[in-house]
Structures are given as C-alpha cells and as structure tokens.
Amino acid sequence: MAKRNAVVVTHTRLRQTGTVVAEAVSQLRVAGFEVAIIDNTEAPDFGVQPPCVSDDTEIVVVLGGDGTILRAAELVHCTQVPILGVNMGHVGFLAEFESFQIDEAIRRVSTHDYSIDERMIAHVDVWLPGATKPIEDWALNDITLERADRGKMVELSIRVDDVEMNSFGADGVIVSTPTGSTAYAFSAGGPVMWPNVKALQLIPLAAHALFARPLIIGSGSTFTIDILDDSMSEGWICCDGRRQRALPQGTRVMVRESRDTLRLARLSGVPFTNRLVSKFDLPVVGWREHARNEASSQSLHHGHTFPAAAYAAGVAVAGDAGVAGTEPDKPGERDGKAGS
C-alpha cells in the first residue's frame, strides 16, 4: 500500500491547550496517514518563498481560523496540495468545517470524498528605484500599500494597463482578490466579489480626493501603483498581513493575476452565497419587513381599510405625517453583526 502523507497546521497556543489537535492527528493516523505537525510558522521576509510541503503530501489539514489558513497557504504555494480548513477561530470564512465536525472531516478526507475549489492568487512585482529586476511575491487575500509614516500621507499614482486613472494622497490602497474581498477590503468599503469572478479590486484608504473610488479590473489587466518622488511618506507593502517591507519614494508596484492558484478542499456543496449570509450573520430581514408584518393583518384608519400591499408599497395614509411603515433600526437594534 502506498504511503499517505498529511500535514496538520495549527498554532502553538491551540496545540498546547486543546485536545482537538491530538484528536485530529490520532484519527488521521488511524486512517493510514503519516502525519507531520506544524504549529509555529513565522512570517518569511517579503519576496522570500518559505519551504513548501513535499509534493507527495496528500492534504494539509488546518486547525485554526482564517489567519492560520493564510499561513498554511505559504506552505503549499506553487504545489498542487489542497488545504482543508477546520475553523477554531471566529468567522472562519475559508474553513470548511467547524471544530465539532472534526470526525466527519477526517473520515471524508480518508476516503477522498471531497472536491477542489481553486482560488485565484494575486502576483505582485515591486520595482525599487534603479532596480534591474523586481522583487516578486503573491497574496491569497490582499496586498496593501500603506504609508510608512503614520503622521503623513503617501502620494500615489494609480494606473490600469499603463493608463493613469488617478493620483492622490492617502493612507494607502488595498488590492484584493475575490477571496480577500470579504476581509480588509470589505471593511474598507469594497464590494464582495464571488470566488468564481476572475478579477482584482483596488480600494483607496482615506484618499484625499473627490473621486477616489474602488476599481475592479479583469484577470488580464494589471494595477500599477507608483509612490511619487515627492511623497511626504515612504510606503509599506504587506501581503496577506504577513510578508512585508518598506518601500522608498519612486517605487513601482504592479499587481496582476498569478498563474498559480490555491486549492481548497470542499466537502459540501454549500454555495458561496449561503456561506456569505451565514458567516457574516447578515440581517436579511430589514426594517421594511417589519412594516409588512404589521400591515399583514390590515390596518383600519379613519374608517378605511388599507391592504397590506399598500403598506409594503409605502403608500401615505391620510392623517399620518409620513408613509406607512416603521422607522429604520436604531444603532444596536439590527439583527446580526458586522463582518469580521
């Protein structure tokens, strides 16, 4: 029988304090896997590829949150090894299972009962002033270019396919993949992009400009971001919140779709839309629905009966100050919560 290899990626605190890691390793070994455990993956330097898992690794099981999955992504970059995430954190957007489902997850892995979801990766070339070749890196979630001096703005020029689109002073910009559109870019006001969309988006951060808005480009296009020579601050680039370095004035950053992808193991057919609603606990019933519910029994006003449809359409009722319905929710009264 051929040897089966698996890698379990977690973090030191979880390994030291919890039994889930020991349980997962035990079950993988019972299923016939030789298991290696990685629990302390320091962020490598920007532009440096850390050692990857061996090509004969069948799967990488990640026990942790989305941050642990981003660390695991460095270990499988440029390989065909898939990642299976078991959420031990808060949102766990990339995870396939929750911690209480570990038995089912290992059983499905051992029988190859999973599909592969290939996620787009962003490639970045950093051209330092006077350089003859770029420093290369990549990101599953996002690439941020921010001000190095927290008291000053960084002056940037934004190009798409070598056509200048805008220039402004700002705290920085985020370039996000579809996977990263529910992370930092989402918090900065960017749109959610479905994973099957082949695109990159650029989100300005507190830009001092009237028309600095998010930009979305197709997979064949390139974002070019120049730190202007007269910028008051140097820049600071960071990939997936891990690999980072300072960038002087005159640096050019170019971001495009990578030829590589990340392979996520999927054990369920839950669509992304369902995952989005459940993970973010979206308040899909808004204040207008409360008006419909109140009107469903029909309201009698001044001797006239008004059907529920009139209320749902926002018809003004004689004698009322405004349209029928309730006021919007006050802060703290909404169902659900904001994203992570």
From Swiss-Prot:
InterPro entries in UniProt: ATP-NAD_kinase_N, ATP-NAD_kinase_PpnK-typ_C, NAD/diacylglycerol_kinase_sf, NADK
E.C. number: 2.7.1.23
Keyword match Transit peptide: no
Main location (coarse class): cytoplasm
GO biological process assignments: NAD metabolic process; NADP biosynthetic process
Subcellular compartments: Cytoplasm
GO CC terms of this entry: cytoplasm
Origin: domain of life: Bacteria
Keywords from the UniProt entry: ATP-binding, Cytoplasm, Kinase, NAD, NADP, Nucleotide-binding, Transferase
Residues holding NAD(+): 66-67, 71, 141-142, 152, 171, 182-187, 206
Region: Disordered, residue numbers: 321-340
GO molecular function: ATP binding; metal ion binding; NAD binding; NAD+ kinase activity
The reaction(s) this protein catalyses: NAD(+) + ATP = ADP + NADP(+) + H(+)
Comp. bias intervals (Basic and acidic residues): 327-340
Necessary cofactors: a divalent metal cation
NCBIfam families with a match to the protein in the record: PRK03372.1
Family in the record: Belongs to the NAD kinase family.
Function: Involved in the regulation of the intracellular balance of NAD and NADP, and is a key enzyme in the biosynthesis of NADP. Catalyzes specifically the phosphorylation on 2'-hydroxyl of the adenosine moiety of NAD to yield NADP.
HAMAP family: NAD_kinase
UniProt protein name: NAD kinase
Protein encoded by which gene: nadK
